[in-house]
Amino acid sequence: KIAIQDASPKNVDLEFRKSLFKLIAGDLRVSSHFRVEDEYLQSSYEGGPIENFLSDKKVDLILRFSATQDLNSASANVKLINARTGTTTSERSYVLNDKKRYPFLAHKIVSEANDQIGAPSIKWMEQSVLFARYTEAKKSEIVLSDYTLTYQKVMVTGGLNIFPKWGNEEQSAFYYTSYNGAEPT
């Protein structure tokens, strides 16, 4: 069983912190490698005897994050703590240059925590999803998203744009079919 503790500074937007908590908890559940303590727990980043063991919650691991954001970026320091011994088993820092993409921060944190315990890979969570969304008759847009659809960015508008497909493994290019007249292009 794993507990998630928010150790973010109090001046960081509470809605952002709780949203990150929910994404991390959801990702841990989706992985099916963890039983997740549902309670939103807060702690200092260093923790103390109570926060580092959580004996009343009967957990084996604690994932503690301290998230910050500024005008453009979002970052998090993360510790994975063995709740039986109170020792930190791993500690990492993550930075995203576009804070709107913060769901990918949660996905990366969970993917690496999953790797730390030696469970089968869930790296697919870190990848982007590309899909077509109809907006009205003969109109659609191509949207880039995370797998939870929490983050969405419209990439192509105008006309009927369908069948998006990644053009490479790095997900830096994509193809799609566009019906802007009688013929597909």
Residue ranges and their predicted role:
Residues 122, 159-177:
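Conserved beta-propeller blade repeats
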Residues 49-109:
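Amphipathic beta-strand/beta-sheet edge segments enriched in Tyr/Trp
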Residues 23-34, 57, 108, 112-120:
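Structured segments of extracytoplasmic/periplasmic soluble domains
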